[in-house]
Amino acid sequence: MSEKIDYSKGVYDAKKLGTGRMFILGVQHMFAMFGATVLVPLLTGLSVSTTLLCAGLGTLLFHLITKKKVPAFLGSSFAYLGGFSIVAPMLADADGNLTVANTKMLPYACAAVAFSGLVYLVASLLISTFGIRRIMKFFPPVVTGPIIISIGLILAPSAITNCQSNWLLAFVALGTVIVCNIWGKGMVKILPILIGVLVSYAVALVTGAVDFQKISEAAWLGIPLHKEAMGLFAIDGSPEFISALFTIIPIALATMMEHVGDIAAISATVGHNYINDPGLNRTLMGDGLATTMAGLLGGPANTTYGENTGVLALSKIYDPLVIRIAAVLAIILSFSPKFEAVINTIPTGIIGGISFVLYGMISAIGVRNVVENRVDFTNSRNLIVAAVILVCALGFNSVGGVGFTVGGVTINLSGLAVAAIAGILLNAILPGNDYEFDATAGSDAATSGNLQV
C-alpha cells in the first residue's frame, strides 16, 4: 500500500511523488522564473540563450555550495539593469527605438558583473570571520534602500522610450501585470510578468506587430555561448573596464541585502533556518560564484528569485531537487537558437509596458526596504544619508557621472557608484549608527509572489 502524503505539512522528499509529478513541478518552477529571467537580456541586449544557460548552471552551482539544502532558483537580477544602462546603454534602431545591443560595451559590463560576484565572496569570508551582525552594520537600510530606489528612477526614462513605439501593447502589458498582481490567485499572482508578456503578445499577433522572419532563419540547435560577448575576454585593464567596475560593483552592496531577505523568506516558507544551516556565508558564496560565472560567460548577474519562493509556498513541495529539475530544463532550452528567436520577436512596446511597472517596483522595493526596517526619518542623520545618496545617484547620472585620472588611467564613476560610496562613508562617519541586523526582516513580503529585484 502506497504511503499517503500530507501536503498540509509540506513535502520535503519529492521522490515520494513519483518521477512524473516531480517533472511537472520542475516545469512549474521554470515557468515561475521564465518571464523575469528572459526580460533582462531583452532590456540589455544580452543573449537570451546565454542567460538561460547561466541561470541553470548558476542554480546548480548554488545548490552544490549550499549542500543541496536550500530550495532556491537563481535567475537574472533586475538590480543590475541600472548598471547596464550606464555602461552599455541600448542603441536606437532606424525607427528610434532602443532595441540595438551595445556590442562594444556589453563585454565590459559582463566583466564588471563577474567582479561584483567576488564582493559576495568577500562578504561570505567576513561573515565567517566576524559574524553577520558586525558586517551588516556598514550596510544598513538607510544606505541600501535609497540605492535601490535610485536604480529604478534612473531606468525610468528608458521605459517611456520603449513604450512610445507602441502605446497599445504597452498599456495591455502594463494592465495585465497590474491585474495579475492585485487580483490574481495562486499561480496567476506568481507569474505576472509571463502572463503580461503572453497576453500582450497575443494582441501583437492580432494587430500584425510581430515579425517572424528571424524565427524561420534560426537553427533548432546551437551553442549558447558567444566569445565576443563574454566578460572573460574584456578583463583588459582599459579605461572602459575600470569605469564599468566602479559603476556595477557598488550594486552588489544592495543586492546582498536582498539576498539576505530572500533567504529569510525561504526559511520562513519552508520552516527551516537556512541562515544558520547551511549558513548565510554559504548562500552568499553560492550566489556570488554563480554571478561571477555568469558574467564571465556573457550573462547577467544572478539572484535568488522570490517568484520561486512563491511557488514553494503555493505547492508546499520543499525538496530542492524540484528546483534542480527546473535548472536542467533551463539549460536544455538554452541550446535552441530557434527558441531565442521566438523570444526576440517580442515587440518593443511590450518590453516598455513590462519595464514601466518593473522599474517602478524596483524603486518601490527600496522604499519597502526602508519601511520594513523602520528607518527613522525624523532623525536628521538618516535624512542626510538618504538625501545625499539620492541626489548623487540622480544628479551625477544626469551629467554623465564623474571622471578623473589616476596613474594615466581615466576613471568614470556613474551616479550610482558615487551614491554608494558617499552613502557608505557618511554612514560610517556620522555618529548615531544604531542599526542592528535582523535576519527575519522582510520575510513575509518576499513570499507574496510580487516582483523581486
Please place each PLM-identified region on the residue numbering.
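Short, non-helical or kinked segments that cap or interrupt transmembrane helices
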Residues: L46-T51, K68-L81, I135-T144, K189-L194, ...
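Juxtamembrane interface elements at the cytosolic ends of transmembrane helices
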Residues: I5-Y7, F34-T37, A173-C180, L191, ...
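Membrane-embedded helical hairpins/re-entrant loop segments and their flanking transmembrane helices
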Residues: V11-G20, L42-H63, K67-K69, I249-P320, ...
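Intrinsically disordered, low-complexity non-transmembrane regions of multi-pass membrane transporters
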Residues: M1-I24, F212-L232, A268-I275, T283, ...
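N-terminal signal-anchor module of multipass membrane proteins
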Residues: M1-L74, F78-T103
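Interfacial segments of multi-pass membrane proteins
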Residues: S85-L91, N181, N308-I323, L329-S334
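Hydrophobic, membrane-embedded alpha-helices of multi-pass small-molecule transporters
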Residues: G20-G35, L169-A173, L191-P192, I223-D262, ...
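Membrane-embedded alpha-helical modules
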Residues: M105-Q213, A327-T440
